[in-house]
A protein has these predicted regions:
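Secretory targeting and sorting signals
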Residues: 2-27
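Sterically constrained small-residue positions within well-ordered secondary structures
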Residues: 20, 62, 72-74, 92, ...
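Transition segment at domain starts
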Residues: 29-75
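Mature extracytoplasmic/periplasmic regions of secreted or cell-envelope proteins
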Residues: 29-31, 65, 100-106, 128
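Intrinsic-disorder/low-complexity, polar/charged segments enriched in Ser/Thr/Lys/Arg/Asp/Glu/Gln
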Residues: 66-68, 78-80, 123-127
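Mature extracytoplasmic domains of secretory-pathway proteins
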Residues: 70-109
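Helix-rich interaction surfaces within compact, conserved domain-sized segments
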Residues: 109-158
Length: 158
């Protein structure tokens, strides 16, 4: 009788474990079943005059420094870019009214967001959805002045 009770207890434990795993899997997907996991979560760095072109985009015409910045890209294409204190140090402020972000996948697939307000103190937040290719290898995010997709003033990295 003990063997049956022990077997039943093990079976019940296995069912509970599988149920918990299934609940976790469904919780990490959106309503369409697309995983919501991060494919990029990285700090942002201001561009310097010595920085190279990245993915066909050139660095801004002045050096930029940033107090704090992060970019987060989820597998479903949701993008959040937080920028604090992105300024031109020789000016002590940001002269631009708006900025946008460019997501790069596979070293060449670029997707640019709509422009958002960019304060004189260098603060901005981009919250957008971008259509990602089926595979997004080596993702990167670049911050663009105004809606100029050919230039970057900050990029993910260190």
């Amino acid at each position: 009788m003990h063997a049956i009770s022990r077997t039943a207890a093990l079976l019940a434990g296995a069912v509970i474990g599988i149920s918990a795993l299934a609940a976790t899997s469904s919780a990490s997907a959106d309503s369409g079943g697309v995983p919501r996991s991060d494919i990029l979560r990285a700090p942002l760095q201001g561009s310097m005059l010595t920085d190279p072109p990245l993915f066909g985009l050139v660095r801004g015409g002045a050096p930029w420094v940033i107090s704090e910045g992060t970019a987060r890209l989820r597998a479903n294409g949701d993008l959040t870019v937080d920028v604090e204190g992105l300024i031109i140090p020789t000016r002590g402020d940001n002269p631009l009214a708006t900025l946008s972000a460019t997501v790069v996948c596979n070293g060449r697939d670029l997707r640019m967001t709509a422009p958002v307000p960019f304060s004189t103190t260098g603060d901005a937040q981009v919250v957008a959805h971008v259509d990602l290719p089926a595979r997004c290898l080596a993702p990167a995010v670049l911050v663009n002045p105004l809606s100029n997709g050919g230039t970057y003033i900050a990029a993910t990295g260190r």
